[in-house]
UniProtKB/Swiss-Prot annotation:
Official protein name in the record: Transcriptional repressor NrdR
Cofactor: Zn(2+)
GO molecular function, one term: DNA binding
Upper lineage: Bacteria, Bacillati, Bacillota, Bacilli, Lactobacillales
ZnF region ranges: unnamed: 3-34
One GO BP annotation of this record: negative regulation of DNA-templated transcription
Family membership: Belongs to the NrdR family.
Top-level taxon of the source organism: Bacteria
Residues covered by region (Disordered): 1-21
ATP-cone domain segment(s): 49-139
Keyword flag Transcription regulation: yes
The entry's keywords: ATP-binding, DNA-binding, Metal-binding, Nucleotide-binding, Repressor, Transcription, Transcription regulation, Zinc, Zinc-finger
């Protein structure tokens, strides 16, 4: 593996362990030339999955695009990168477990929101406002009222 520090092609594996319930191998490597240590992740290459966007166009499923949306929604919130990456893993696993070659962006967005609402309600509202394209304050307030009703129901249980 090429060293990200000096560009040398030789490195050795210092530590290797499974993560993400065994679906990913995390490897700590050390450059044989400069001694720089870095981490790599190895996962099974998944079959192509196309996302059908709202306008009908299709693009390949992109984990990073989902992560960027979550990071943007969680800005200045108490969610760490590991929690957000775990969210993306859960969404991708759920999407791929459906066994379909295509999935709508709406379904992916709903999966993200279903996980995000339990982790951070403010980040959820931010994500939902972009994803659902709130047209005005009334739609925004309706979403907040729905969340408040769900909270009240949880408290009664």
């Amino acid at each position: 593996m090429k060293c990200p520090h000096c560009g040398n092609n030789g490195s050795r594996v210092v530590d290797s362990r499974p993560t993400d319930e065994g679906r990913v191998i995390r490897r700590r490597r050390e450059c044989e030339k400069c001694g720089f240590r870095f981490t790599t992740f190895e996962r099974v290459e998944a079959t192509p999955l196309l996302v059908i966007k709202k306008n009908g166009s299709r693009e390949e499923f992109d984990r990073d695009k989902i992560l960027k949306g979550i990071v943007r929604a969680a800005e200045k919130r108490p969610l760490n990168m590991e929690q957000m990456t775990d969210m993306v893993d859960k969404v991708e696993n759920k999407v791929r477990s459906l066994g379909e070659s295509e999935i709508s962006s709406q379904i992916i967005g709903e999966y993200v929101m279903n996980i995000l609402v339990d982790l951070d309600e403010i980040a959820y509202i931010r994500f939902a406002s972009v994803y659902r394209q709130f047209k005005d304050m009334h739609v925004f307030l309706d979403e907040l009222q729905d969340m408040m009703k769900k909270d009240e129901e949880k408290e009664k249980e």
